[in-house]
């Protein structure tokens, strides 16, 4: 199987952490769309949003998704990538989409433990726990709609990777 694997889910679900280790275990290339975009523009996500607002960032995010999609690649996407209908169809039609699902409490704890998350612009201007709750309520149905595989991401990364590999084996052998 050489199809790209798209990891989707909210901030803090482990897309980058799991993605790097999953790519290594599958002997694949790893790309994070936010990191790729930041390196191309030499700007942080917050700087891009400040300069181009969210609409401009979302357009660049779509271009990044198309640019990094390649065979034998694990792609960690931005949490809002599913907000654009084109992106949802693109991922569904060009690879296997894995939703890393976790409850609000886990996401908030992870985000509070990661100081680099302070570099991310707020989506709602609300306190973190309220923002995560609101954003997840808005996006969960979209994550589920686009996903070929849904994985409980509350476990340790090694367990999440094992579950993804098992689900991939079942998907391929159907």
Curated annotation (Swiss-Prot):
An example GO CC term for this entry is:
cytosol
User: How many and how are cofactors bound here?
Assistant: Binds 1 Mg(2+) ion per subunit.
**Where, in this chain's numbering, is ATP bound?**
12-17, 120
This protein's pathway reads: Metabolic intermediate biosynthesis; chorismate biosynthesis; chorismate from D-erythrose 4-phosphate and phosphoenolpyruvate: step 5/7
Q: Where in this protein does the record put region LID domain? A: 112-126
Q: Which GO terms describe its biological process?
A: amino acid biosynthetic process; aromatic amino acid family biosynthetic process; chorismate biosynthetic process
EC code:
2.7.1.71
Signal peptide range: none
List positions binding substrate: 34, 58, 79, 139
Domain of life, per UniProt, equals Bacteria
| InterPro entries registered for this protein in UniProt | P-loop_NTPase, Shikimate/glucono_kinase, Shikimate_kinase/TSH1, Shikimate_kinase_2, Shikimate_kinase_CS
UniProt-listed SUPFAM superfamilies? P-loop containing nucleoside triphosphate hydrolases
Quaternary state and interactors: Monomer.
In terms of HAMAP family, this protein maps to: Shikimate_kinase, Shikimate_kinase_2
| Domain remark from Swiss-Prot or TrEMBL | The LID domain closes over the active site upon ATP binding.
Query: Family, per the entry?
Result: Belongs to the shikimate kinase family. AroL subfamily.
Q: Which NCBIfam families match?
A: PRK03731.1
- State the name under which the record lists this protein: Shikimate kinase 2
Q: Which organism is it from?
A: Shigella flexneri
């Amino acid at each position: 199987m050489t199809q790209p694997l798209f990891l989707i889910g909210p901030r803090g679900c482990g897309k980058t952490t799991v993605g790097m280790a999953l790519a290594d275990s599958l002997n694949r290339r790893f790309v994070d769309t936010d990191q790729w975009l930041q390196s191309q523009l030499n700007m942080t996500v917050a700087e891009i949003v400040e300069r181009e607002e969210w609409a401009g960032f979302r357009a660049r995010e779509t271009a990044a998704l198309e640019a990094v999609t390649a065979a034998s690649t694990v792609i960690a996407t931005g949490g809002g990538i599913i907000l654009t209908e084109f992106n949802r169809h693109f991922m569904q039609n060009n690879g296997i989409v894995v939703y890393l699902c976790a409850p609000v409490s886990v996401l908030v704890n992870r985000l509070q433990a990661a100081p680099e998350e302070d570099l991310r612009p707020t989506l709602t201007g609300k306190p973190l726990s309220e923002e995560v709750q609101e954003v997840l309520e808005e996006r969960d149905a979209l994550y589920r709609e686009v996903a070929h595989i849904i994985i409980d991401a509350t476990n340790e990364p090694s367990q999440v990777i094992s579950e993804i590999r098992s689900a991939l084996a079942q998907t391929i052998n159907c």
